[in-house]
């Protein structure tokens, strides 16, 4: 009976350690991704907005296919 109890405790301990190791590894991976990006959410958002504005400016200067330039419309 004591052998079964010891075996059960060893297996449960191994399972708990494995689960804890997997959980800590997942948290580290998420943190690493945030560290790698290195830019806060606001900077990324402003970068996206600048990209949209730049495309619009290019489209106004050189008309997009199927559109005329604003200077030609007036």
UniProtKB/Swiss-Prot annotation:
Domain of life: Eukaryota
Organs and tissues of expression: Expressed by the venom gland.
Localization (cell): Secreted; Target cell membrane
GO cellular component: extracellular region; membrane; other organism cell membrane
Primary location recorded for the protein, binned into one broad class: secreted
Positions of the pro-segment in this chain: 22-33, 69-74
Signal peptide: 1-21
GO BP term, pick one: killing of cells of another organism
Keywords: Amidation, Antibiotic, Antimicrobial, Cleavage on pair of basic residues, Cytolysis, Fungicide, Membrane, Secreted, Signal, Target cell membrane, Target membrane
Cited function: Possesses antimicrobial activity against both Gram-negative and Gram-positive bacteria, as well as against the fungus C.tropicalis. Also possesses a relatively high hemolytic activity. May act by disrupting the integrity of the bacterial cell membrane.
Protein name: Antimicrobial peptide HsAp3
Lineage of origin: Eukaryota, Metazoa, Ecdysozoa, Arthropoda, Chelicerata
């Amino acid at each position: 009976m004591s052998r079964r109890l010891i075996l059960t405790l060893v297996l449960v301990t191994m399972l708990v350690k494995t689960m804890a190791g997997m959980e800590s590894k997942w948290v580290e991976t998420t943190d690493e991704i945030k560290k790698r990006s290195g830019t806060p959410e606001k900077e990324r958002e402003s970068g996206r907005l600048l990209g949209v504005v730049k495309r619009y400016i290019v489209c106004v200067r050189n008309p997009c296919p199927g559109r005329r330039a604003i200077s030609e419309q007036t």
